[in-house]
Amino acid sequence: DKLWTRTNIRKNLGYEGPVIFSEHHESHAASAFFPSPFQEAAILTMDGVGEWATSSLALGKENKIELLQELHFPHSLGLLYSAFTYYLGFKVNSGEYKVMGLAPYGKPIYSKLIRENLIDLKEDGSFRMNMEYFDFLGGMTMTNHKFEAVFNHPTRNSETKLTQKEMDIASSLQ
């Protein structure tokens, strides 16, 4: 269907002019900056993944947005959060709010483990995920046995009762 988007737009709308697409993070930046009351602003966008960008830093000034930096797939806070969503037994792309909701009931006792093993936070605010712990590149799951070993606990089955451990992991991620 995506291959025929331009054709379908022209056919369904009776439109003959050019059809232009913007990049995913560019759209996020524009929808945040242009309706804002600011003439100049720093713009930070972060989500799972757009085309290849997962995070972007831009400068909005008057009627222009200048891209300053991008992080690219697979290094993504959105995908990191989805990996934890999966590991904690919730459905990816719909259960992330449950992880956020669990966080206040836990203690961030695993934060150091997460930083030491799963994500490398850089001085400039960027980050790199340690892909040895994740399976979303080619596997059928978000995480793998090495991820489970970090927490000394298997991936939670969605039918099992939540424990303090899951709450502490959610708090540590948050």
Language model segments and positions:
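Short acidic/glycine-rich loops and adjacent helix/strand connectors
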Residues: D1-Q174
